[in-house]
C-alpha cells in the first residue's frame, strides 16, 4: 500500500467505545453492530459475542475490554473501518473503561430509555469528556412499554450537558436504529490524527499471555507504522524485540502485513518474560525511536487488600506464575509475597473492589486450576505512631500495639447514590448505619434523587452494594470516588482459637461497632469450626481484653456406659480420668480452620449486627 492509499485509509478509520451503566444494553448493541457490518456470520452469532470469557457469559457482565475491527459500507458510498472497543460498566472496572477511551476518538453513550441516566453513566461520561472524545448519545430499549425517550433526553441535557436533540433512538434487541448509529459514527466521530511518516508510537492498552507466542500486546497506533520483522523497543523498560506477527481482532485474530496510524490491533514479538511489558507503555522502533513516550495511564491505587493462599502450600510457585500471567491481562491487580502462621506462604493482593477480588479468585481457580483461601478484605490505614513516624498498613495483623499509636486514619469516599423518591429514607438510614455523613441531595426530576454522602471505604467494601440493592428493590445505582484520609477511632480485634491468635482472622473496626461485630463473628466461627476431641474456646480480644467468647464443645465418649449402678466414686474416677486426658490433648492440640470460617467473616451482613 503506497503513501496516498495509506492517507486515504486513515481518513476512513473511526475508533469508538461504548459506555453505559450496567445492564443498559452495551454488549447487545455491540452484537447488533457486528451483525449489521457482517463481521460475524449469522450461524456464528450468539448473545454477547465480545464477552468471550466463560465467567463473563455466566454472570452476564463485561469484565474485560475487547477490541474488534469492522468494515461498514456507508450511505455516501465509501467503506469505513471501525474499531469498536467494548467496555465494562461496573464501578470496579472503571480502569478498563479509562484504558479503552484512551485508544478512541469517539464514544457511544448508551442510556436505557426506561431507567435514564444512572450513577455509572455519569462517571464514565466524565472520563470520556476528560479525554476530549466526541460523544454520540444513544437512547436504547425504546421498544419497552415503560420507555420515556423525551424524559431521558432532558436528563442527558440537564445532567451531562450534551445536546440530546439529535440523540439516536434505538433498540439493540430488535435492531431498531442501528444503521443510524453507524452513520452518526461516520459523520460525528473524527478520523485519527497522526503522522504516518513520524517514528512509530503505539500505546499498549491491554496484553495477555499465550503459551506458544509469549506475551501478546494489544496496541493503538498513534504515529507511524509497524510490520513483521521490525525491531521494536518498549520505552519504559527499554527492552527490544523483533515483531513476529501483527494483526487485528475481527473478532478472532486475523493476521495483517502491517498496522498504521489509527489502527487498533495486536503484535507478538516472542516476549517470554512477563515483567518486560506494562499496560500503558509506548512501543516504538529500535532504530528510529520516538522522542518521548505517550502519556500512558495514571497508576491506579488498589482499594481493597486481601491475603491469597494456596490450600496446598506446595502450589505457592504455581500461584505466583498464575498471578503474573493474570496481571498482564488485568493491569489493576497488585500482589506481593507474605506469610501467615495459620495459612503458610501466600500473597497480599490489591484489588479495585469486591467484585474485582471475586473475579480474580474465580479466574485463578478456573483458568489455572488452583484451590485458594482468601482472607477477609481490608483497606489501607495510615497509622501515626507515638515516635512521630507514620506507617501504611493494609493487613490487620501488622497493626502496631495500641500503646504505640497516636492516631489511625482511614480512607473516605464521596458516594453518590441515585434512587427513586420512595426509597430515599431507606438509603439514608443505610448510609447513616455505615457511618456516612450527609452532604447534599439533588432532585434530578420529579421521581429521582441523587443523594451524596461522605463514607468510610471500609464500610462500603463489605456488603454495602448488596444492602443498597435489597433496600431499594434493585432501583438504586451507586458510584464512589476516594476523597482522602480522616482520623477515626479504630481498633484491631484479634480472634483467638484455643488461646492462640489466628493472624488471618484479625480485623480492624470502629470502636463503636467492636462489641457487636465480635459477637457476630465469634458466633459464626462457632458454627463453621468443626468439633474436636477437646473443647475449643473462640475469643475476640482488643489487646488483652476479651470482649466476646463462644465455645465449640468437645466430642466425648460415654465412659460411664459400662457402669451398671455401683459406687459413685467409681464413676467420678472415670470422668476425672477422661477430663485429664482431654486437658492434655487440649494443651498439644491444634485447630484446623476451614475456608468457610474466613468466608463467614466476609458474609457478615447488617441483619446480624442490627438492633443488637
UniProtKB/Swiss-Prot annotation:
> What SMART domains is this protein classified in?
EFG_C (SM00838)
**tr-type G domain: residues covered:** 11-193
Which coarse location class describes where this protein primarily resides?
A: membrane
Report membrane topology: Peripheral membrane protein
Q: What does the UniProt keyword field contain?
A: Cell membrane, GTP-binding, Hydrolase, Membrane, Nucleotide-binding, Protein biosynthesis
Q: What is its EC number?
A: 3.6.5.n1
Role, per record = Required for accurate and efficient protein synthesis under certain stress conditions. May act as a fidelity factor of the translation reaction, by catalyzing a one-codon backward translocation of tRNAs on improperly translocated ribosomes. Back-translocation proceeds from a post-translocation (POST) complex to a pre-translocation (PRE) complex, thus giving elongation factor G a second chance to translocate the tRNAs correctly. Binds to ribosomes in a GTP-dependent manner.
- What protein am I looking at? Elongation factor 4
Organism of derivation: Latilactobacillus sakei subsp. sakei (strain 23K)
